[in-house]
Amino acid sequence: RRQRQMCIRDRADTAIVGKILGVDALAALGTVESINWLVLGTIQGITQGFGILVSQQFGAKKEEALQETIFHASFLAVVAAILFTVGILIGLPGLVGILQVPVDIRPICLDYLYVLFGGIPLMMLYNFTAAMLRAFGDSKTPLTACVIAALFNIALDLYFILELGWGVKGAALATVIAQTLASAYCLWKLSLIHISEPTR
């Protein structure tokens, strides 16, 4: 479901950018899509692994072990987010070169990716909180957050690109802000859960 919503969001981004900003911007977004999915897939793999560990402890009703697992998973998620963000941002020019992105659209690609991947900690936060919620039996909240984020992303795309003229940077910023909203919603719902009791 998460991937389906990501597809909807990405297709909306592509349609808006292509219609308003033209062929070069559209080509840039299409070119970096594989990088975007690689980063997202890595983050999802990490956080889903944490979710499996937490769900096992939660299902076994081992509250002390559960608390420790959540603490260590949270710490590792923070460390991974920091290292991943720094590494990706430093390595972006080289990565774009390895992928043989056409020279004329490289600046557009980098403008988009620097803003988007500056929000990697927020991607990690959303996916981590979503994984924790699923581990506790709540699969509705992550989906709701994802749908809300997709709608906000489209609205912000139109505002930042049409009204403010921020180009592909505006499209990337819209995604980061939408991710922030999704993260905040999931974090709030997670704070309401008493881990000693099953969710309903």
Per-region residue spans from a language model:
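Interfacial helix-capping/hinge residues at the ends of transmembrane alpha-helices
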Residues: T14, G51-I52, P93, A130, ...
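Short, small-residue-biased leader/transition segments that mark boundaries at the very start
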Residues: Q3-I8, E197-T199
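Extracytoplasmic
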Residues: Q5, R9-G18
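Alpha-helical transmembrane segments of multi-pass membrane transporters/permeases
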Residues: A77, M132-A155, L173-V176
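Alpha-helical transmembrane segments of multipass membrane proteins
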Residues: R11, F128-M132, I154-Y159, L187
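Small-residue-rich hydrophobic transmembrane alpha-helices
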Residues: L26-V86, M123-P142
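Short alpha-helical transmembrane segments in multi-pass integral membrane proteins
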Residues: V54-G119, E163-S196, R200
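Interfacial/gating helices of multi-pass transporter permease domains
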Residues: V17-W37, D104-I108, V168-K169
